[in-house]
């Protein structure tokens, strides 16, 4: 018989840097999960990613307090900021442009995010990432 699902916990944790402090500790502690066990497993799974990159994770907690988790790709905004070499997006994206990204970089980000996005094809996903870039105050160049 399958285990009964108690809760789904969605978090954004820095790759390779999960520790029992907030937000991880309180979110998992409420569900009765062994926090250190999660931290060790998460850090081992995200070893290949750049350390400190915010990584969304969905943790499925079962009624016997065991858990499984699935890591997603980092948010498009984070990948765009990294590609453009900026700290943050623009507060007024229509007026103040803070950086530039090439279409090739946008396409590369779309291909990275393809596993998590529900776009019809790579072109649609690329357009979606371009929209995110524009809303952050980035200029998309050919």
UniProtKB/Swiss-Prot annotation:
A Pfam family reported for this protein in Swiss-Prot or TrEMBL: Ribosomal_L11_N
Q: What are the protein's UniProt keywords?
A: Methylation, Ribonucleoprotein, Ribosomal protein, RNA-binding, rRNA-binding
Q: Name one GO molecular function term.
A: large ribosomal subunit rRNA binding
Its BP terms in the Gene Ontology are: translation
User: Quick one: a GO cellular component term?
Assistant: cytosolic large ribosomal subunit
Q: Which PROSITE patterns match?
A: RIBOSOMAL_L11
Family statement drawn from the similarity comment of this UniProt entry: Belongs to the universal ribosomal protein uL11 family.
Quote the PANTHER family the UniProt record gives: 60S RIBOSOMAL PROTEIN L12, LARGE RIBOSOMAL SUBUNIT PROTEIN UL11M
Please describe the quaternary structure of this protein. Part of the ribosomal stalk of the 50S ribosomal subunit. Interacts with L10 and the large rRNA to form the base of the stalk. L10 forms an elongated spine to which L12 dimers bind in a sequential fashion forming a multimeric L10(L12)X complex.
- What is the name of this protein? Large ribosomal subunit protein uL11
Q: Which organism is it from?
A: Erwinia tasmaniensis (strain DSM 17950 / CFBP 7177 / CIP 109463 / NCPPB 4357 / Et1/99)
